[in-house]
Amino acid sequence: MPIPCPHFKITIVKRSQGQSAVAGAAYQSGERLFSEYDQKTKFYNKKKELVHAEIMLPSHAPPGYADRATLWNAVEAVENQWNSQLARRIVLAFPVEVPKKQYLSMIKEFCQEQFVSKGMIADFAIHDKGDGNPHAHILLTLRAMDEHGKWLPKARKVYDLDENGERIQLPSGNWKCHKENTVDWNDQKYAEVWRHSW
């Protein structure tokens, strides 16, 4: 018998809306984290409902990113625009049919298969207040890293070419070009893939 699809919400942490990846990580983990960006300590007491919090790294990520403050301060440092997108946030409910003892293995398997294996860092926390709404928060990095653990650009400039393979010059003297994402993680199709996989 199929399990009904539980709550699954995806949002982007945006600096333009006054949001912070460090604050998001502090909220879900219950840790006290200092934000180098705004020089403020972020703390939201979630100890009563926190079951487990963990950071899962791809093999090429710097080991230091297993520290929550180091990771999210590094993310905020590389995103230097006022309107930067800092992280992807997913909040998902555990199906009521799943025993509590399976929550950790279930969320780790989901994060590994859907995110970490693709190069994202996944910072997750399982919350359970005992009110019948056990759920997990996942913060994901938006930038890929090279094999040395250096953040890569989110997009690159690509010059448009004519039928002869030559760059097209505009009347302004500039070359016609467009931006291409360096990873396809923002493609809308993944929202459905992730929901279906959960």
Question: Where are these predicted regions, by residue range?
Answer:
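N-terminal nicking endonuclease/strand-transfer module with a His-rich metal-binding environment
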Residues: 1-197
